[in-house]
Amino acid sequence: MPGTSVSDLSTATAVDAPALLPLPVARPSAPAVVRGKLYIKTHGCQMNEYDSAKMADVLAASEGLELTDNPEEADVVLVNTCSIREKAQEKVFSQLGRWKALKAGGKPVIIGVGGCVASQEGEAIVKRAPYVDLVFGPQTLHRLPELIRARRESGKSQVDISFPEIEKFDRLPEPRAEGPSAFVSIMEGCSKYCSFCVVPYTRGEEVSRPFEDVLVEVAQLAAQGVREINLLGQNVNAYRGAYGADAGDPAQYADLGLLIRTIAQIEGIGRIRFTTSHPLEFSDSLVDAYRDVPQLANYLHLPVQAGSDRILSAMKRGYTALEFKSRIRKLRAVRPDISISSDFIVGFPGETEADFEKTMKLIEDVGFDQSFSFVYSRRPGTPASDLQDDTPETVKQARLARLQAHISAHAASISQSMVGSVQRVLVEGPSRRDPNELTGKSENMRPVNFPGNPRLIGQFVDVLITEAMSNSLRGRIQLDDSAH
């Protein structure tokens, strides 16, 4: 953020985080005059959730638009799209078709399409759905006010799917906390070009936010009561944030390990997470951060995608199953009880039964706690889309069911093993199942429900786990310090 800095960063190393001088304190912004309503429909990943929140911030600050959960009362209606899954485009046009009626009777509703499908399709969206007013990519959401004004003044649809580096972060308003946990985007894009993935084409290559900018945003959120920070990026552990150049010295670069160490020094931050990471960038510096930083959650999401070296090579992942396991061994040497989740693609073109068995062997060897697993979905324009895919869909679905059942059973055993333990839980709010109870998450991402005073919301509490349910844990607040 222009005009702000963290002083004396020139001596920072991957081992010693720079000593922080007082960071800028977040001051409440003057509330914008409400001049209309905004509806946003979000599909896809946590990065999209973050981007949607920033869209709302930008339009509240500049246009006085207030969020609504009813598109029929909105003056601006946006869909933030995801292109990871098959038929993503058709789902978007189906959504737009339903929204076309919002303009009935000449109502001047602005309809906009953002996100990765917008980046892929661009002008084609307006050609197919001429009632769409705005098409904008993930890197141009900060230009929404300009696009809306241009649309209203010219009467023509506006399309901007350019990749202006990291400019969008420089032009976003001060972050607004909405609860004790917050996402902070630290980088955009991916330069790995896995053969199945559209991200480099829809979000561009890797670009990291400056080190100081990230720290200022975290400090502002902490001053508003945020206690847990989740650092976001398509390939978050490739982060290389520049610092030091303002003092006239050549820029230096902070990796994710150093960023975590420094965030841990910010008053109020009690837990740090990050997602999503790539095994190629899982460095010793990051392992050392797990060793040294107690605020770093005892949980890691590290997508492996497959356990067969032949399939990993076809996916262009850049590592073998043995190399992946080596990284996990290093991590467990410093965090023996860490929970690890992963992503898996089943039925990648050319996957044989032997290949799939190697994936199952890897799952058994690593002991994954949770997974996001899917049957391979062909994405047009990616190298993998040209590969011959002759595995029957029924076989793919059977493999997926077997993989998911195995990981679910292991996750259930981990949950059961937590009964009788004391877990540190960040209280997020009332439980959805019982408003008289509170809910939060354990370090390994399990929802925990327990009786408690609503005044505890936003605080960390120790909870004695008394029961493991299918998708959550139950417990009671542990008041006896001797339990540690």
Swiss-Prot record:
Molecular function, one GO term? N6-isopentenyladenosine methylthiotransferase activity
On cofactor binding, the record's note says: Binds 2 [4Fe-4S] clusters. One cluster is coordinated with 3 cysteines and an exchangeable S-adenosyl-L-methionine.
Residue numbers spanned by region Disordered:
428-450
- Which GO cellular component does the record give, naming just one? cytosol
What residues bind [4Fe-4S] cluster 2, as annotated? 190, 194, 197
The record's catalysed reaction(s) read:
N(6)-dimethylallyladenosine(37) in tRNA + (sulfur carrier)-SH + AH2 + 2 S-adenosyl-L-methionine = 2-methylsulfanyl-N(6)-dimethylallyladenosine(37) in tRNA + (sulfur carrier)-H + 5'-deoxyadenosine + L-methionine + A + S-adenosyl-L-homocysteine + 2 H(+)
Major localization listed first in the record, in broad terms: cytoplasm
Q: Where is the Radical SAM core domain?
A: 176-415
Subunit (UniProt): Monomer.
Purpose: Catalyzes the methylthiolation of N6-(dimethylallyl)adenosine (i(6)A), leading to the formation of 2-methylthio-N6-(dimethylallyl)adenosine (ms(2)i(6)A) at position 37 in tRNAs that read codons beginning with uridine.
Q: Which HAMAP family match?
A: tRNA_metthiotr_MiaB
> Under what name is this protein listed?
tRNA-2-methylthio-N(6)-dimethylallyladenosine synthase
Organism from which the protein derives: Xanthomonas oryzae pv. oryzae (strain KACC10331 / KXO85)
